[in-house]
């Protein structure tokens, strides 16, 4: 009897733990069981236990109901993303009851605490006075993500503060760092990436800092290279510094004319003016320095006078290699700027004209600039009677490189019938977007040599992407053309691949035709 009672109690307990849907089925099954039991009297077990006996057969189904496999996982991920979007600006959201069960991974559950007051045991007042934002935090999560936070909350000198003020970090950058720590997600934007890098460096979050540097290297251009150079030195990022110098050297005139150049500090200004490899006319360097001086006067609340411009430039003025300017540039530009003293102007004029040159404080040796490299894609060239005429049609080829380079121009063939003049329109495109073009004339001497035709400014080329090089030539004479073209050419440390272009309407392709050379800086 005791054994029967224990069995009955166990069955009843199991039944009470079942979902309602299973209980309902149990009742129906019990009725059938009672009917058969009364008629045959073959079973002495309580009717309710009939369903318990089949519980093992339903175990898989119940587990599937409790732990769905595919659909809930997607919806969970979607809801987490939606929650993140809301939580960037709203930190007072209260999760649904039993929210832990909605997210299968610790990463997703941890992400629910991002910018959330729930269980927060510390708050940060982030940003400068007048632009602060109060953000919640959880000491354990922060300490796991940053050694600085660990020392702050659990170290020997830890202070038990409920509120911590951080005036030197922008709220958006601090949130980006918190999102990485809580959610293991990197969310960077062009307007906040530098501030995020500062935060990642300050709180020693190295993987986020590396992601910021990669983002900056990818978005590096002549427009922002000078500012990023200044910041890379501040953050002690030598790789980023080197990338900045590569852009500034190759696209010096674009970089010097950019608005960002005027935002650099004095130390960076000196570094750029001292640079031996700048590919720029010295008059452009001079004008850029004056533009910087004007903005610096505004930063120092000084009147925009010639005296103050010279004052803020200081000794950096003598890093400009004024004696190396073309005489016309000096006479019409620097000499009339008012920045030079009368004695300096007279001495520089004498430097240009006199046999006995005066001593100058300015550097009188021209910059070396960068030496252009040439990628020649044909193994031979030829000419045949009535073989290659232009007639205003387009010769085009596509190419890709494995390292960032700067295309300065193309090397083109000339006349095979003696000296001749050609009009050339050169163009460089990426996915149909024109990146650079120029219209110029060049003379050929009848030889099979190539003749350079330059873009106004070198064009930055990113690796592993095909670009289209095109030229439309206008000339009456027959021209040389290339033969035995190569699909891949090694030029120093740069590998260049070639393929045919659909823009080519004059016969140029990989195996033969025109545009024999790419001229570039690397």
Curated annotation (Swiss-Prot):
Disulphide-bonded residues: none
SUPFAM superfamilies in alphabetical order: POZ domain
Annotated compartments: Cytoplasm, Cytosol; Nucleus
Entry superkingdom: Eukaryota
Role of this protein: Acts as a key regulator of dendritic field orientation during development of sensory cortex. Also directs dendrites toward active axon terminals when ectopically expressed.
Name of this chain's protein: BTB/POZ domain-containing protein 3
BACK domain: residues covered: 235-300
Main location (coarse class): cytoplasm
Record-level Gene Ontology MF annotations: identical protein binding
UniProt feature, compositional bias: Low complexity: 32-44
Domain BTB: 120-190
GO cellular component labels: cytosol; nucleus
Record bears the keyword Nucleus: yes
Disordered as annotated region, ranges: 25-44
UniProt keyword annotation of Cell membrane present: no
GO biological process: cerebral cortex development; dendrite morphogenesis; neurogenesis
Alphabetical keyword list: Cytoplasm, Neurogenesis, Nucleus
PROSITE patterns associated with the record: BTB
